[in-house]
Swiss-Prot record:
EC nos: 2.3.1.234
GO terms of biological process kind: tRNA threonylcarbamoyladenosine modification
Name the UniProt record assigns to this protein: tRNA N6-adenosine threonylcarbamoyltransferase
Organism: Xylella fastidiosa (strain 9a5c)
Record keyword Transmembrane present: no
Length: 348
């Protein structure tokens, strides 16, 4: 099956073609992403109405571009996958509307994909994918979750943030230190120049049982340290380093605790913060020390993209699942409510 995937949940327009007849990363025939960062920069954050309108402008040209790169005509497609949630309702409706219209015109099945399932499955696009069961850390601007993956499509939430997501904390700390939008990646780049230990911030919630996270208190602690400093460039890089180390340590401690909880040695990390170099190195070292394995998508597939939607959609379409003809999106959507790809009774 040749499946086209459409991602439009927030401020990236993504389109990709996945071919189930091929294996490994070669199965991704083409993928294109258009980022709206420049559009939203002057507002310091994503403006939902502007995001929706820009998806309208960019989606059809991106579809044509991606099909051309895949050397396919639209008539050769066997199915359509699209992000149905969670996300911004207007942005989701743009992608869902185009996807449903395309599927109807081609008389092929369509499937609405959970955005975070797309992220979770993105490391499986690589040539040496992880095998289930595994623990997944989903870490982005909107989510920080630990999920036990007993089988593809069978997910148990182990823990999540009680307030700010890790990526959101990165962006907010960057903003309070005067870095331009989007600040998270710039903060991480500054942290590489900082001196470890110059600023030592709390590792939140690691001193209590459980697998939940909280980053709002850490954000406030960094704010106070910054305000009480001379706010020089030298201090900025050291504060950035201290903050990043605190977040990375917290995520690593909770990931190891999650692996122990489910007696598993494979960790999958996905989402925008999964591209962070310090986090990757720390989690890889932790898993190696345990005799396990940490798996990541390549950095280009950590941010929102159509490839993960095409892949996740292909798995569900191959399992015989499809969405009805109505254009429906789910801005808030619990991943544990997704139907399994294989009956749970068949796996016992």
């Amino acid at each position: 099956m040749k499946i086209i995937g459409i991602e439009s949940s927030c401020d990236e327009t993504g389109v990709a073609v996945y071919d189930t007849a091929l294996s490994g990363f070669a199965a991704l025939r083409a993928h294109s992403v258009y980022s709206q960062v420049a559009l939203h920069a002057e507002y310091g954050g994503v403006v939902p109405e502007l995001a929706s309108r820009d998806h309208v402008r960019k989606l059809l040209p991106l579809l044509r571009q991606t099909l051309a790169e895949a050397k396919l005509s639209v008539e050769e497609l066997d199915g359509v996958a699209y992000t149905a949630g969670p996300g911004l309702v207007g942005a989701l409706l743009v992608g869902a509307g185009v996807a449903r219209a395309l599927a109807w015109a081609l008389e092929v099945p369509a499937i609405g994909v959970h955005h975070m399932e797309g992220h979770l499955l993105s490391p499986l696009l690589e040539d040496d994918p992880p095998e289930v069961p595994f623990v997944a850390l989903l870490v982005s601007g909107g989510h920080t979750q630990l999920v036990a993956v007993d089988a593809i499509g069978d997910y148990r939430l182990l823990g999540e943030t009680l307030d700010d997501a890790a990526g959101e904390a990165f962006d907010k700390v960057a903003k309070l230190m005067g870095l331009p939008y989007p600040g998270g990646p710039q903060l991480a780049a500054l942290a590489e120049q900082g001196i470890p230990g110059r600023f030592c911030f709390t590792r939140p919630m690691v001193d209590r049982p459980g697998l939940d996270f909280s980053f709002s208190g850490l954000k406030t602690q960094v704010l106070l340290a910054w305000r009480n400093s001379d706010q020089s460039d030298a201090i900025r890089v050291d504060v950035a380093r201290g903050f990043e180390d605190a977040v990375v340590d917290t995520l690593a401690i909770k990931c190891e605790r999650a692996l122990d909880t489910v007696a598993c040695q494979t960790l999958v990390v996905a989402g925008g913060v999964g591209a962070n170099k310090c986090l990757r190195a720390r989690l890889q070292a932790m898993c190696r020390q345990r005799g396990g394995r940490a798996c990541f998508p390549r950095p280009a597939l950590c941010t929102d993209n159509g490839a993960m939607i095409a892949f996740a959609g292909a798995l569900r379409l191959q399992a015989g699942q499809q969405s009805d003809i109505a254009v429906r999106v789910t801005p808030r959507w619990d991943m544990a409510a997704l139907p399994p790809l294989v009956s749970r009774s068949c796996r016992r």
